[in-house]
Regions:
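Non-catalytic, topology-defining segments of multipass membrane proteins
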Residues: 2-282, 327-377
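Short alpha-helical linear motifs
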Residues: 158, 207, 290-296
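Active-site-proximal inter-transmembrane loops
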Residues: 230-237, 291-317, 321-324
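Alpha-helical transmembrane segments in multipass membrane proteins, preferentially the mid-helix core
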Residues: 283-287
Length: 377
């Protein structure tokens, strides 16, 4: 969602029956207010599964569980994913349903990447390991967290177009989709966080939120198939080109790694790195919506999880992120390590980034949970 002066963007979240209004009062500054008379109406469907979800989640976030109760009306259930019943709504059996071509393609590629990792011990060299680390940073930090997430999805800072496109190309090499697809899907996630319309809602089960949503595109496309929320990206020829030629760039990167370093570089720089970045990224959607701490009252299940914060270059400070989606900085406290924010600071110092958006202290105080026994800020 594009943020600009004089524009008011309203997002509705079922939290204590209120609707939060986000108003842009200055470049990069958003004030939050409550419309106390505006109630969010939820219809009930699949009561048994919803009751189960509420019971299991009440210990970690009773407000969010209550908000989601009965929210499944009009949404087709996802297919059941192995070990998904940590927290789940009623599902259709995955083994008797028809797998569409996209499901087979995704499952096959992800499976081949994991099988390739079995060769890692037999192809290890220090050069291959250095290639892994370099590609981990290039695709994971520069590509996914810096470009796809903070710049393209949330517009938290601006760079020259040549740099924007270069960073987005790094994101494409992570094999998580083209820039348009990724940004659009992520905006749907924030619009419908932890509700049935969230593409990777934890209420469909831990494994669904981790990776199952990628393997059931019939259900996922119903939730994120509309790309109209990323029209400003679709209007740019570069992103349309990447959408049409995406897989060719993936294949070219694999060929290049093999040509430079042989099988060790292919296994470590492509297979191991891809699987590693996959699970780190997916853990933000799953682990950081299940385990960790909440500093801000976001009305959802987002958590600050420090191991994911480190491994995902700052993305694990997820409660902070859901409180201030526009913020270029996710680690809002000095001890919350956020490498992506450090990269943004370097770009800003080099005058390669501007319009960097950050929350004000007053905004953070307003969103914080009140101390035990204290009054709300």
């Amino acid at each position: 969602m594009t943020l600009c002066v004089g524009v008011i963007a309203t997002t509705r979240r079922a939290t204590l029956g209120t609707t939060k209004t986000r108003a842009v009062t200055a470049p990069g500054v958003i004030e939050l207010g409550d419309e106390s008379d505006d109630q969010v109406v939820w219809k009930r469907l699949g009561q048994q599964g919803v009751d189960k979800a509420c019971e299991l989640w009440s210990a970690v976030n009773s407000e969010a569980a209550a908000a989601a109760k009965g929210a499944w009306a009009g949404v087709k259930p996802a297919h059941k994913v192995f070990l998904s019943d940590i927290l789940a709504s009623p599902k259709r059996n995955a083994f008797v349903r028809k797998w569409i071509e996209t499901d087979v393609t995704y499952a096959s590629f992800i499976g081949v990447m994991h099988l390739g990792c079995l060769l890692a011990p037999f192809t290890f060299t220090w050069g291959a390991f250095k290639c892994f680390l370099a590609m981990y940073f290039i695709t994971g930090c520069l590509g996914i967290t810096l470009s796809y997430h903070r710049q393209l999805s949330h517009k938290s800072f601006r760079t020259p177009k040549w740099l924007e496109y270069t960073l987005a190309y790094c994101g494409a090499l992570a094999v998580q989709g083209d820039p348009l697809e990724w940004a659009s899907s992520h905006r749907h996630h924030h619009q419908h966080t932890d509700t049935p319309k969230d593409p990777h809602t934890p209420y469909e089960g831990f494994w669904w939120s981790h990776m199952g949503w990628l393997l059931d595109n019939e259900a996922t496309i119903e939730r994120v198939g509309d790309r109209s929320n990323a029209q400003e990206l679709a209007a740019q020829p570069f992103y349309r080109f990447m959408e049409k030629t995406y897989m060719w760039h993936i294949a070219a990167s694999a060929v290049a790694l093999y040509a430079i370093g042989g099988l060790p570089w292919l296994i470590w720089g492509f297979c191991v790195r891809t699987v590693w970045v996959y699970h780190i990224t997916w853990a933000v959607n799953s682990v950081s919506h299940c385990w960790g701490s909440q500093e801000f009252n976001t009305g959802d299940l987002s958590r600050n999880n420090w191991p994911i914060g480190i491994l995902a270059f700052g993305e694990g400070w997820h409660n902070n992120h859901h409180a201030f989606e526009f913020s270029a900085r996710h680690g809002l406290r000095w001890w919350q390590f956020d490498m992506t924010w450090m990269v943004i600071c370097v770009l800003k110092f080099l005058r390669l980034a501007d319009k960097v958006k950050l929350p004000k202290e007053a905004q953070m105080e307003r969103m914080r949970f009140a101390p035990a026994g204290g009054a709300s800020a």
